[in-house]
Amino acid sequence: MVAESKAANPMREIVVKKLCINICVGESGDRLTRASKVLEQLCEQTPVLSRARLTVRTFGIRRNEKIAVHCTVRGKKAEELLEKGLKVKEFELKSYNFSDTGSFGFGIDEHIDLGIKYDPSTGIYGMDFYVVLGRRGERVAHRKRKCSRVGHSHHVTKEEAMKWFEKVHDGIIFQAKKKKKMIRRRRR
């Protein structure tokens, strides 16, 4: 009885809050501007350049150098782009793609699989998709006036996100192989 009433509540429905698409080029310059054009073509909005947090000498990256481009999409456009991205992955994800907070992410190798025409001057770029799931009513935690907390039962869990993916997108989730823990022996 309680489970049925929880399922019928429209506030309990899981929705896509936002979709973040990221292309990390690893260097600034011409390749980064071409990647931003690809992302602008895909999302139909202007992307934002991301900067490196640390200097990594082996990769030739300096701190605060522009190395990536990302775009945050919400609403119907986010659901359309998510559908295109999942088609490339054939609606198959692994269990470790899902986080404990109910979000999930995956990557694709070539942007031309999403339906964008190949341009030899642009090249081919891979990208990461990050999907943030939530429920209606979570605005109370983020608003400026009369801010309050969202209850623990209203948060999206990993299991709920996986069930949502299987139900809404008819997706398949593979169980990831468990990593063996290394036993460290003390030297005497």
Curated annotation (Swiss-Prot):
Q: Its Gene Ontology biological processes?
A: translation
Q: Where does the protein principally reside? A: nucleus
Which GO molecular function annotations are given, in alphabetical order? rRNA binding; structural constituent of ribosome
Swiss-Prot/TrEMBL keywords: Cytoplasm, Nucleus, Ribonucleoprotein, Ribosomal protein, RNA-binding, rRNA-binding
User: Coiled coil where?
Assistant: none
Q: Does the keyword rRNA-binding apply?
A: yes
Carries keyword Ion transport? no
Q: Where in the cell is it found?
A: Nucleus; Cytoplasm
Q: Which family does it belong to?
A: Belongs to the universal ribosomal protein uL5 family.
What is the protein name for this chain?
Answer: Large ribosomal subunit protein uL5
Q: Which gene encodes it?
A: RPL11
